[in-house]
Swiss-Prot record:
Biological source species: Lacticaseibacillus paracasei (strain ATCC 334 / BCRC 17002 / CCUG 31169 / CIP 107868 / KCTC 3260 / NRRL B-441)
Pfam families, per database record: Ribosomal_L36
Cellular component terms (Gene Ontology): cytoplasm; ribonucleoprotein complex; ribosome
Keywords: Ribonucleoprotein, Ribosomal protein
Family the UniProt entry places it in: Belongs to the bacterial ribosomal protein bL36 family.
Lineage of the organism: Bacteria, Bacillati, Bacillota, Bacilli, Lactobacillales
An example Gene Ontology molecular-function term: structural constituent of ribosome
Superkingdom as given in the UniProt entry: Bacteria
GO terms (BP aspect): translation
Name of the featured protein: Large ribosomal subunit protein bL36
């Protein structure tokens, strides 16, 4: 899980989701792409 000030999709499998007011990226193909804004 990367924590970044700005999150971007890193590949076509990445999805933007909002959980508890936080913007997160989840990726089914590459778990390294998981990110959270904060």
């Amino acid at each position: 899980m990367k924590v970044r000030p700005s999150v971007k999709k890193m590949c076509e499998h990445c999805k933007v989701v909002r959980r508890k007011g936080r913007v997160m990226i989840i990726c089914s193909a590459n778990p390294k792409h998981k990110q959270r804004q904060g």
